[in-house]
């Protein structure tokens, strides 16, 4: 353990220390104040004779007389299966009044590198109970599928609903949720804690809560602690783990804040140039590994600044992940929950997780037909604004009515409503029956004969 009393500068959350011996990147540091108080930190830059240290608890109270001890190790996460049912802080400390975690192992939070050749193709359907996701943008086990939202939209409610309801239908294999909230207010933290406890979802979950007034460096660490926990449960205890993060925008803002404090050359809109690589380090920890029974599925949630989908955060996230679920402000204004706009939404792995033996044989065709009919109905709304409804043909009126009914019955559902995939597909058929059968050009006749409401009643 190396100890120095050579603090040369204090700038915001950073401490600069002159060194004489080599110091490791991301090495842990203890700063002992003159009154004996100990603060923790981490090495951010050790390339020069002056080491940059990010102080977790902030630099107030630190002076040139404070001593800096380099501990010779990086952050390790104490993990145990007993973490299920626990609520932890962004640094892994208990928030629920329970005892400290007695670790079975202490793991590096950066995670083990996964050989790309050893990854298995995702193929198992995860039912979230939300029709717009299950029916139109299916989540597959091992996938990373982000939710793009905006400020003031109910993405936290959607996150909680997915955490409560997500399951692999027909599977008896153990399923767990790791919920990671970053940069949230104390009020939001209370809401999350109460909801998990009220619904009983906490029994199969590990919850990490990083608050808005916690240090920026902790916000960088929190998702890595969550993913390390998920990897331990998945690959050591053969569990299928769903990791939900909210809000990745707060994480990226912390990256920008730390980059500015280090006086790095900024990239697009002031974010560090390595943000793509940093996000990939998190998202690429999802997947299924050959020879392991467990899996990790990720649902990162982010708020798009100014609802701009071309902003660097959603833009880079879209390059790394396998699709996106888009939460729309216009649907929210109509008081529709969840306000998920299926038109720009996409699940790139959907075709691998649906069909006979997984969901139902007609799933792909019904989804395609709903997309097509809804798009046509939305286009007709623009035409109605110009020429009026009376100028429409009977066929056009049917598509217009379908678009309204689709939003009101298929997209809209209760916050506690858990629809099975059969209920979702049957509801889609009920809505498609509003259209003439000859307009269902995306669906094979054998499925129309089997599932169309007018045929089933005979």
From Swiss-Prot:
CC annotations in GO: plasma membrane; proton-transporting two-sector ATPase complex, catalytic domain
Transport found in the keyword field: yes
Protein localization: Cell membrane
UniProt xrefs under PROSITE patterns: ATPASE_ALPHA_BETA (PS00152)
Lipid bilayer topology: Peripheral membrane protein
Pfam families: ATP-synt_ab, ATP-synt_ab_N, ATP-synt_VA_C
Stored Gene3D superfamilies: 3.40.50.12240
Keywords: ATP synthesis, Cell membrane, Hydrogen ion transport, Ion transport, Membrane, Transport
GO terms, biological process: proton motive force-driven plasma membrane ATP synthesis
Domain of life, per lineage: Archaea
Subunit structure: Has multiple subunits with at least A(3), B(3), C, D, E, F, H, I and proteolipid K(x).
Physiological role: Component of the A-type ATP synthase that produces ATP from ADP in the presence of a proton gradient across the membrane. The B chain is a regulatory subunit.
Name of this protein: A-type ATP synthase subunit B
Natural source organism: Methanocella arvoryzae (strain DSM 22066 / NBRC 105507 / MRE50)
High-level lineage: Archaea, Methanobacteriati, Methanobacteriota, Stenosarchaea group, Methanomicrobia
């Amino acid at each position: 353990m190396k100890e120095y009393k050579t603090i040369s500068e204090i700038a915001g959350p950073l401490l600069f220390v002159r060194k004489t011996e080599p110091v490791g990147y991301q090495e842990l540091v203890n700063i002992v104040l003159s009154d004996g108080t100990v603060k923790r930190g981490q090495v951010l830059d050790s390339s020069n004779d002056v080491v940059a240290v990010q102080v977790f608890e902030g630099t107030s109270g630190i002076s040139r007389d404070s001593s800096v001890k380099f501990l010779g190790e990086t952050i390790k996460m104490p993990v145990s299966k007993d973490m299920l049912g626990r609520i932890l802080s962004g640094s892994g400390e208990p928030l629920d009044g329970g005892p400290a975690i007695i670790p079975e192992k202490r793991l590096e939070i950066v995670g083990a590198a996964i050989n790309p050749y050893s990854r298995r193709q995702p193929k198992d359907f995860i039912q979230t109970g939300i029709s717009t996701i299950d029916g139109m943008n299916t989540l597959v086990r091992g996938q990373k599928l982000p939710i793009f939202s905006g400020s003031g939209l109910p993405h936290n409610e959607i996150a909680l609903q997915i955490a409560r309801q997500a399951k692999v239908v027909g599977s008896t294999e153990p399923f767990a949720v790791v919920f990671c909230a970053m940069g949230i207010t104390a009020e939001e933290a209370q809401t999350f804690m109460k909801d998990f406890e009220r619904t009983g979802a906490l029994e199969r979950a590990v919850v990490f809560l990083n608050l808005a007034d916690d240090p920026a460096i902790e916000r960088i660490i929190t998702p890595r602690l969550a993913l390390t926990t998920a990897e331990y449960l998945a690959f050591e205890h053969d569990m299928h783990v769903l990791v939900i993060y909210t809000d990745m925008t707060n994480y990226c803002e912390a990256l920008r804040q730390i980059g500015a404090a280090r006086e790095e050359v900024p990239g697009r809109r002031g974010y560090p140039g390595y943000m793509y690589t940093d996000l990939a380090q998190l998202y690429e920890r999802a997947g299924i590994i050959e020879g392991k029974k467990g899996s990790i599925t990720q649902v990162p949630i982010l708020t798009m600044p100014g609802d701009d989908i071309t902003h660097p955060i959603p833009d880079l996230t879209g390059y790394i992940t396998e699709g996106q679920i888009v939460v729309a402000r216009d649907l929210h204004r109509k008081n529709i929950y969840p306000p998920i706009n299926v038109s720009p939404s996409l699940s790139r792995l959907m075709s691998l997780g649906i069909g006979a033996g997984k969901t139902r044989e007609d799933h792909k065709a019904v989804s395609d037909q709903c997309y097509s009919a809804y798009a046509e109905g939305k286009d007709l709304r623009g035409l109605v604004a110009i020429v009026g409804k009376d100028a429409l043909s009977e066929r056009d009126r049917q598509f217009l009515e379908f678009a309204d009914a689709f939003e009101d019955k298929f997209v809209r559902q209760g916050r506690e409503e858990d629809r099975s995939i059969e209920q979702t597909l049957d509801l889609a058929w009920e809505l498609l029956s509003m259209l003439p059968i000859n307009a269902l050009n995306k669906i094979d006749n054998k499925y129309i004969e089997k599932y169309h409401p007018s045929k089933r009643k005979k």
